[in-house]
Each structure stands twice: as C-alpha cells, then as structure tokens.
C-alpha cells in the first residue's frame, strides 16, 4: 500500500481543518510498550498477552456500551488484564501492578514529537480525544513531555460512554468550539476512524498494522501508515 492515500475520491476537506484531534492509545502512544518493559517477568507469551490485553480492553468497552454499563477506562483496563493474566496462568500480583503502572507512562511513537511540532508551527490547533479517563491520560501525557502541544485532552468520561458513541465525538464541538467539518480526526483504530467520519469529522486512519479496512459506516478521508505522513497530507511544510 502507499504511505498516504485518498479514500473517498473527493477534493480533500483536510486542507480546511482548523484542529487535529488525535486518539491516544495506539495512535500517539504505543500500548505495547507496557508489556515490552516487563517482558522478562511475563515470559515467552509476552507479545500474545499484549495483543489479547488490547483486544479484550476494546471488546469490554463495546460490551459495556451495549449494556449501558459505563465504567472508567482504568477499571476496564484492569479487568481486561486480569482476564489475560488468568488465560496465561500468571498469578504474580506484582506483574499486574507493574503492567498497570506502565500503562500510565506509555511511550509515544517515535515520529510523534516532531510531527506535533510541525503542525503547531503551522498554526494548527491540537487536541486528544480518548477512551482513557483523566486519571490515566494526565500522567501519561505529562510523562511524555508533550502536554504543552495540546490545547485540550478530552476524555469520554465527560460523556459517560465509550467510542464510537456520537456523544464522545460531540465533546470536541462542545469543548473546542469548532464545527465537525473543521476537525481532522486521527485514529489507528479503524472502527474509531469510521465512527468519527460517520459523525462528520474529516478522518484519517493511521493504519500502523497494514490491516484491511472495516466495512462500517463513515467514509474515511485518507489512510496513512504512521503519523510522519500527516504534515504532508495537510499541506504543512
């Protein structure tokens, strides 16, 4: 695939974007870095556990949305981890504590700081919209030394529901005072990208895994392999 591609065949709405709103986990921050730091304590199943943890974490948010049973993402993350530790027979509570602690200081992807600086210099507003609750997001963004790049770090906690419920994307309108058609939304989660596009954002799928598209409502504006390609997509020098 190409590093950057148009998806809808129409003149790009991205050029008129006033604000770039980023998903956090998997888009700006590498959720696999939590397990990577403690690989020795987990053993040969570390990569499989990391994949299962993320899959269960997202699955639980969808199921809770369907049940009308919202809980903070920190709780959901712990519940998903407990399932995975049980699945791989890991009973050491210290491993659980280390992994959850690492989740509060995930590594940003390598291209992220320079990319944000380029967008900021070009006059674009920057924000985060995440399933994470503030008690998770604030320490993570702070540890990354990227907090000053963002005018807002928005959490679904304010809506009491997880992505891709439209109430989540509406937070950007309410908090940032911008129309949906002026928002460039970026997510590595294809279902999140489609949800945001269906809401009305101009959406870029950051397809880090080179995965096939999901057959969901909402037309994506573009697809890129990582965020290093975003400035060029937006016409930023």
Regions found by a protein language model. Give the residues of each.
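Asp-based, Mg2+/Mn2+-dependent phosphohydrolase catalytic module
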Residues: 2-17, 117, 124, 129, ...
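Active-site neighborhood of HAD-like aspartate-dependent phosphohydrolases
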Residues: 9-58
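An amphipathic alpha-helix signature
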Residues: 35-36, 50, 54, 74, ...
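A metal-dependent, Asp-based hydrolase signature
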Residues: 41, 47, 61-97
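Short helix-capping segments at alpha-helix termini
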Residues: 42-46, 87-94, 121, 145-149, ...
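Residues at secondary-structure transition points
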Residues: 44, 48, 68-72, 94, ...
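Short, acidic loop-to-helix structural element flanking the phosphoryl-transfer center
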Residues: 74-75, 92-128, 135-138, 166
